[in-house]
Amino acid sequence: MIKQKFSFAVVVTVLLLGLTSCDDEFTPNAEWREIPSVFCLLDQDDDTTYVRLQRCYLGDGNLYSYGSVADSLYYPAGEVEVLIRVWRNASDMSVSGATPIYVLNFTREMRDKVEGSFASGPQPVYCHRNMPGELDSAYTYELLVRRVSDGSTMASATTRLLGDPDNTYGWLKSPSPLSGGGVVTFNMLSGSCQIKWRPIDRGRLYQPRIRFYYRYRFLPDSLRYADIPCDAVKQTSTQILELTTAVIKEHYLNEIRKKLESDTNHKKFVDTVSVIMDVADENLNAYISSVTAMDGQDYQSYNNIVGGVGLFAARRAHLMERVRSDKGDQPNGMHSLLENLNVGFQQNDL
């Protein structure tokens, strides 16, 4: 396995909500060719699936002219349709006269991104409200962008969902999930804590994080948290039965300090944390790898859209298990470590 530091949650945000625009009209003088730019991530735990669809142009004209024109970025309402056909087997798609199990239809909606990178006003996004059973890891999903006027396919791609955790054992092995009744706690007594988990089908890149909980001393019902990222892990073989990473004490405490140092409230210790796991499939892993290489001169952006550019991939972003956190009173126990951060924890209130 290969470890790297990367949070693909950021990439996902850019994929779905990423571009700004202006109001000029598109009148390039050079020859050009229009192609769709399509981004979609499937997660069976999402209540809504989004497709980001834009137009991009290939040609020899001025890049600033091509890239800065609002009217050139989006297809007008009613010009294209977006749908996902669901097949029991990938081979069925090439069988003459075969029909999918069902079809997921998308509606065009205007959405705002009001803060952060690429903040902008209303932009069109294609949405489908997921119904129970529609997203099944056993099926193959075929994304289609079609021109309404003649029904022709402009862009297409296929993917499968990531697998589900084992029904009996789950995905997290250590520390012990509270739901499983195990005895291995999340602790820093040895200077680090090992996180161990079972791979899921078609998972290739795993990004764990620790959700550190705390309460305000005078608001005991105010459960709050700070997310602490861990090293990402790549799965390099389907034969691997266990993946692992380590949460280093110095990194963990430093991240807590940075996230809480501006909060002057008196805080209380909570004796549990959550282990959260974000997972990417091979397509998303390849795309992330190409994005991280963009700071060099020679790179090739990953693309799996037939007839266009972009990405159709699968992820898991909702895997979370609560575990017991050690609160030992010894000098290297969490009581003393938190108090020494000087961010509002006190030994007699922990």
Description of each model-found segment:
Residues 18-21:
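C-terminal motif of bacterial Sec signal peptides marking the signal peptidase cleavage site
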Residues 1-9:
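Bacterial N-terminal signal peptides that target proteins for export
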Residues 23-350:
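A sequence/structural signal for flexible, mid-protein segments enriched
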Residues 10-16:
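Hydrophobic helical h-region of N-terminal Sec-dependent signal peptides
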